[in-house]
Curated annotation (Swiss-Prot):
Domain remarks: The presence of a 'disulfide through disulfide knot' structurally defines this protein as a knottin.
Family listed: Belongs to the cyclotide family. Bracelet subfamily.
SUPFAM superfamilies in UniProt: Cyclotides (SSF57038)
Cysteines paired by S-S bonds: C4-C21, C8-C23, C13-C28
Keywords: Disulfide bond, Knottin, Plant defense
Name by which UniProt lists this protein: Cliotide T10
InterPro entries: Cyclotide (IPR005535), Cyclotide_bracelet_CS (IPR012323), Cyclotide_sf (IPR036146)
Tissue: Expressed in seed, root and nodule but not in flower, stem, shoot, leaf and pod (at protein level).
Amino acid sequence: GIPCGESCVYIPCTVTALLGCSCKDKVCYKN
């Protein structure tokens, strides 16, 4: 539920995905 500061509208989460973030509602979130 915490925004990671990366969007995933056109491409998936990249850098933040390594930190455990996943795409939700076009934004990368963690918990």
